[in-house]
Amino acid sequence: MEPIIALLIGNGGREHTIAWKLCESPLISKVYVAPGNGGTASNGAESKMENVNIGVCDFEQLVKFALDKDVNLVIPGPELPLVEGIEGHFRRVGIPCFGPSALAARMEGSKVFSKDFMHRNNIPTAVYKSFSNYDHAKSFLDTCTFDVVIKADGLAAGKGVIIPKTKKEAFEALESIMLNEEFGSAGKNVVIEELLEGEELSILTFSDGYTCRSLPPAQDHKRAFDGDKGPNTGGMGCYAPTPVASPKLLETVQSTIIQPTIDGMRHEGYPLVGILFTGLMLTPSGPRVLEYNVRFGDPETQAVLPLLESDLAEIILACVNHRLDAIDIVISRKFSCAVVCVAGGYPGPYNKGDIITFDALKDKNTRIFHAGTSIRDGNVVTNGGRVLAVEATGDSVEAAVRLAYEGVKTVHFDKMFYRKDIAHHALNPKRKTREILTYENSGVSVDNGNEFVQRIKDLVKSTRRPGADADIGGFGGIFDLKQAGWNDPLLVSATDGVGSKLLIALSLNKHDTVGIDLVAMNVNDLVVQGAEPLIFLDYFATGSLDLKVSTSFVEGVVKGCKQAGCALVGGETSEMPGLYHDGHYDANGTSVGAVSRDDILPKPESFSKGDILLGLASDGVHSNGYSLVRKIVEYSDLEYTSVCPWDKNVRLGDSLLIPTRIYVKPLLHVIRKNIVKGMAHITGGGLVENVPRMLPSHLNAIIDVDTWEVPEVFKWLKDAGNVPISDMARTFNMGIGMVVAVASEDAEETMKELTSVGETVYRIGQLVDKESSSERCHLVNLNKWETF
């Protein structure tokens, strides 16, 4: 193999550390650093390092220099040249670059792009919304009930992430970014996301576009002062590996975050060759991605590269040649700590040009990596806010920290400042003596939740319809009204549950029908207002998530959505130990539909005396009255597994679980013919309470209960429970699940149309003038129900 002549782009502590590690390799003959700093400057003829006075984004001069010096490997350090496309410039002249393309660098260059990528690839992160319009962002922020983080979309020199303490500060930050252009074009778009709480973790991962290998997990200290106080900085210190990152946690991060990220980038056409920096928050719900960078982190690099025992140059070559899987990466079992020394005043205004002096380091495991330094008149002087880092390795975190701070004492410059508590999270004695509590050992399984999402994704996607892609995992479901053919509709919403029918499902361990009930109870309430159901969202709450039960439930929801023609665009699965016991769960649904302004039902002005009431047959009890049903079953001494008294071919419970009939498509068929005046969904309250809900104040309804055959289930319930007829009428649908009001001259046509699409329809009553003391819905021939 020919000797490697490397061109390293950058001038920070990260670049000094990379150059130092590269120079340990026998493969390296020279490392040019452009522009470099006081630590990378040549210190003699034997030195492999040499600074080159070319800016990091002066691509023309960098390429010319590389060609002149026979450079055969380029390693960009900072983010700006990567985002600006440095990789492409060197690719065009045939020089391999250990860094991503401009397309892949969008993962760091655009917060909006990276968050959308996470959403597309089901990578766990904070809920978010992005905006290019200030007024829209302000309106959203005004509705937020959670603490937020506001992020400028583009690169903002590490200052574009703002964590407001109050809503007032949040509005001020938004105005500063989007209106006052504090970060210039970087703030043209913003991301507003939920503030996550927990411990942060940074993981640097080598990637060849397919294979990925991670360095030890590190923990940075962003705040300027001890105790994580003060303003944000570029990083005041770092240690690795961090004890909070257990092997199990790292396996989870690898399988749910890092590998899916590498795979997702390749699948989307911009594979990552280089370093993936993943910033994580360890929340009670599991690890969540805060950000991606596409280069070595700073000061993480200063802490983790000293732990790398393998040849860095060999690893980088394996990445650019797409054969990372062919080499082993060996990591020291030691610990590392890097303490950053900064100029007085940092991260605010600070002096440059102060002379730095160094005493001899007392331990061979201690190193100094320069950052904001330069050489002037033979002296090393300050040339930036973060001046240098003192790093040390030891057999424990405590040993590494002690050696690093001993090394800090050998560095001297005017107004030098550093934090005194680097690695305090690991050294906190309370952490060592107290039991570690996690979300999982409190009763909530994050892994189960993630597996549940994976199981139902394809089911959910099967409900796609024009206007909605039925993709889950985002902040909210989106529906495109125009794509669905609506121009200026009114939106109609409904929310409902299934009720105690769920207890029968639990008794039989049969959960695939109650999801249909959930959809039906919502969409039937929409269609009676003339609305076409467009989207549905479900809420499933339980004490401990049973994957089989929850998946079966969602299968039912999907069936219901398909019957109704609406898209399942999202939902919430809530695991609440202590609130639900013995496998119990509850469910709620919400549906949104659309109706043209002129087609809203009922149409009160169109009703008249003599209008006909048509009844559409129900499929049984549907979803109301189950508290009474269960009490009757209890009194009957039957079990839900007993043979059904009115159908010897099924169990009692199976018959009672027959789902609510969904009337949407047949009713929309006749609604669009403009012959329907109003409709009533017969739920709790029966005919006597639901039919009046569609009537104008001057009309009443008369319904003849002898015009249809009451299903056997209601006959059994009445007899087994000795239930008065008046209670039966006000509790159950008694065989009529939907009532439609039409003009007398349209009754036959309507019945024919509904029958042609599979409905059983009865002519059950008519409208009459209201009398002062009369019932709004009077049932005649009730005596027929006495003699079932």
From Swiss-Prot:
Q: Name one GO cellular component term.
A: cytosol
Chief place where the protein resides: cytoplasm
> Where does the record say this protein resides?
Cytoplasm, Cytosol
Relay the cofactor remark from the entry: Binds two magnesium or manganese ions per subunit.
Recorded hits in Gene3D superfamilies, A to Z, give:
3.40.50.20, ATP-grasp fold, A domain (3.30.1490.20), ATP-grasp fold, B domain (3.30.470.20), Phosphoribosylglycinamide synthetase, C-terminal domain (3.90.600.10), PurM-like C-terminal domain (3.90.650.10), PurM-like, N-terminal domain (3.30.1330.10)
- Matches recorded under SUPFAM superfamilies: Glutathione synthetase ATP-binding domain-like, PreATP-grasp domain, PurM C-terminal domain-like, PurM N-terminal domain-like, Rudiment single hybrid motif
The segments labelled GARS in the record are 1-430
Cofactor(s) this protein requires: Mg(2+); Mn(2+)
Which EC class heads this enzyme's classification? ligase
Q: Tell me which SMART domains the record gives.
A: GARS_A, GARS_C
A Pfam family: GARS_A
In what residue span(s) does the ATP-grasp domain sit? 115-321
Q: Which of this chain's residues are annotated to bind ATP?
A: 141-202
| Biological processes annotated in GO | 'de novo' IMP biosynthetic process; adenine biosynthetic process; purine nucleobase biosynthetic process; purine nucleotide biosynthetic process
List GO molecular-function terms, semicolon-separated. Answer: ATP binding; metal ion binding; phosphoribosylamine-glycine ligase activity; phosphoribosylformylglycinamidine cyclo-ligase activity
Q: Which reaction does it catalyse?
A: 5-phospho-beta-D-ribosylamine + glycine + ATP = N(1)-(5-phospho-beta-D-ribosyl)glycinamide + ADP + phosphate + H(+); 2-formamido-N(1)-(5-O-phospho-beta-D-ribosyl)acetamidine + ATP = 5-amino-1-(5-phospho-beta-D-ribosyl)imidazole + ADP + phosphate + H(+)
- Annotated pathway: Purine metabolism; IMP biosynthesis via de novo pathway; 5-amino-1-(5-phospho-D-ribosyl)imidazole from N(2)-formyl-N(1)-(5-phospho-D-ribosyl)glycinamide: step 2/2; Purine metabolism; IMP biosynthesis via de novo pathway; N(1)-(5-phospho-D-ribosyl)glycinamide from 5-phospho-alpha-D-ribose 1-diphosphate: step 2/2
Q: What is its EC number?
A: 6.3.4.13, 6.3.3.1
Q: Where is this region: AIRS?
A: 437-769
Q: Which residues bind Mg(2+)?
A: E291, N293
Instruction: For this UniProt record, give its keywords in alphabetical order, as a comma-separated list.
Output: ATP-binding, Cytoplasm, Ligase, Magnesium, Manganese, Metal-binding, Multifunctional enzyme, Nucleotide-binding, Purine biosynthesis
Q: What does this protein do?
A: Catalyzes the second and fifth step in the 'de novo' purine biosynthesis pathway; contains phosphoribosylamine--glycine ligase (GARS) and phosphoribosylformylglycinamidine cyclo-ligase (AIRS) activities.
Family indicated by similarity: In the N-terminal section; belongs to the GARS family.
Name of the protein in its database record: Bifunctional purine biosynthetic protein ADE1
Which lineage? Eukaryota, Fungi, Dikarya, Ascomycota, Taphrinomycotina
Q: Which gene encodes it?
A: ade1
